[in-house]
């Protein structure tokens, strides 16, 4: 699989792979190809389609070195696959729409921040569903 390979209609391998260029991993581009990846990305594509607007992935998979360097939780879903998504234009209403639709679609993890929403499918691997809001 090359970095230009599309995983879904609107999301590519490159967008999801580890981009730790400013970290100790040097941008290793790792991305485990697993059932969890496809499950999560099918849901993310469906969310994007329902939203009717493009989403920027600001963080996808992280290797352990990258995750440590950004202060990620030791058991972060980004070590598997999670996506921090940001609507273009950082529109607050669109962030709320992303949160609402993600909840309706039963994403396993939904975390709302000032400029992005964290989405993951932790339930797929047996983790407890989680919701949090870190907006200031």
Regions found by a protein language model. Give the residues of each.
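Extracytoplasmic cell-surface/polysaccharide-interacting catalytic and binding patches
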Residues: 1-48, 123, 133-136
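Glycine-rich, flexible loop/turn motifs
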Residues: 3, 7, 66, 73, ...
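Helix N-cap and loop-to-helix transition residues
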Residues: 12, 37, 63, 90-91
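Solvent-exposed, flexible loop/coil residues
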Residues: 15, 20, 65, 70, ...
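Extended, low-complexity, intrinsically disordered C-terminal regulatory tails
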Residues: 41-70
């Amino acid at each position: 699989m090359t970095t230009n390979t599309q995983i879904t209609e609107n999301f590519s391998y490159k967008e999801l792979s580890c981009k730790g260029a400013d970290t100790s991993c040097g941008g290793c581009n790792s991305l485990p190809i697993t059932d969890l990846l496809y499950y999560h990305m099918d849901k993310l594509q469906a969310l994007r389609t329902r939203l009717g607007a493009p989403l920027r992935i600001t963080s996808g998979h992280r290797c352990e070195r990258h995750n440590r360097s950004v202060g990620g939780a030791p058991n972060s879903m980004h070590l598997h696959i999670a996506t921090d998504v940001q609507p273009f234009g950082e529109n607050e209403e669109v962030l709320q729409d992303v949160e609402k639709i993600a909840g309706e679609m039963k994403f396993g993890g939904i975390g709302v921040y000032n400029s992005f929403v964290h989405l993951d499918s932790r339930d797929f691997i047996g983790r407890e569903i989680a919701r949090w809001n870190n907006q200031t």
